[in-house]
Amino acid sequence: MQLSDFSFELPDELIARYPLETRSASRLLHLDAKGQYHDHMFTDIIDLFEEGDLLVLNDTKVMKARLKGKRATGGAIEILVERMLNHTTAYCHIKASNSPKAGAELFVGEDNIPVIVRGRHENLFVVEFSQPILPVLEQYGQLPIPPYFNREAEEIDTERYQTVFHNPEKIASVAAPTASLHFDEELLAKLDQKGVKKTFVTLHVGAGTFMPVRTDDITNHVMHSEWCDVPQETIDLILATKARGNKVIAVGTTATRALESAAQAHGGKIAAWTGDTQIFIYPGYEFCIVDRLITNFHLPESTLLMLVSALSNRENILAAYEHAVKDRYRFFSYGDAMLIDKLEV
């Protein structure tokens, strides 16, 4: 399967660079189990879900992971904290005119907090902070909004690039689980009143989510690694949902990857799991847990577009995307949403 199989034309003006005034005011394109698409508003999910269905949400929180700083010589640098190893050490991306060497001292924030580059780990730098990382990020960091916004983070992003249900103890992502950004408290309450249940997994989203596929044959692509947790409580609810004949609805590709990673770790069995995942889902993959997926519209030739193409199929997804472009849906992180049903065989 070739990378070019997942290409489509997207006018730049359809990229949503700011959120709508109301989270749940987005549009929704439903791709059903027969491969037919239907236009809705996002709040119509109340009618598209059944009592007893289960929503699986990713409760991670986005860090203010981007730090501006300088070298000892005064040259500008930028650090993006990818993964914290402990309170003071992290794997980081560093933008600089020249790559810093092991032992280099850098300074971040307005108060010039010292950090030291300790070495490399694959394509990342191992960076030791002189103070605990999270307070430094909270005081001096910026939210790492996606590069396709083509702007700096603003005050509106502080609220709107986080989910309303994030767990403040789970602050470790460098990108939001964006399908969840459509849910506000009112919509969640209405789903609860209908009897739609909800549960949580955790997947800390890494910057690799924005990395392009660079191999013509997509099967040669190596996925980035992300930490996830699928707890026993969630597994119990999934098993009960399937026993009732109801649907498991993953909210976002991150929740999907967490659930399917847990299943793959147990040979396809539905069971709890915690660990690092590099799962790459593309057409031909057999889903073990996910029946339906809520997701945003994704970049051409991205691994996320490949994932959604595995749940329906590539032709159906690209036809739905073509319709979305013609009908002026809003794309990417702050854009509109899709509800995709697993294709009936």
From Swiss-Prot:
Coiled coil: none
GO molecular function: S-adenosylmethionine:tRNA ribosyltransferase-isomerase activity
Gene Ontology biological process terms from the UniProt entry: queuosine biosynthetic process; tRNA wobble guanine modification
S-adenosyl-L-methionine listed as a keyword: yes
Compartment list: Cytoplasm
Catalytic activity: 7-aminomethyl-7-carbaguanosine(34) in tRNA + S-adenosyl-L-methionine = epoxyqueuosine(34) in tRNA + adenine + L-methionine + 2 H(+)
Keywords from the UniProt entry: Cytoplasm, Queuosine biosynthesis, S-adenosyl-L-methionine, Transferase
Alphabetized SUPFAM superfamilies for the sequence: QueA-like
Keyword Zinc-finger: no
Pathway listed: tRNA modification; tRNA-queuosine biosynthesis
EC id: 2.4.99.17
One term under GO cellular component: cytoplasm
Enzyme class: transferase
Family: Belongs to the QueA family.
Subunit annotation: Monomer.
Function statement: Transfers and isomerizes the ribose moiety from AdoMet to the 7-aminomethyl group of 7-deazaguanine (preQ1-tRNA) to give epoxyqueuosine (oQ-tRNA).
Protein name in UniProt: S-adenosylmethionine:tRNA ribosyltransferase-isomerase
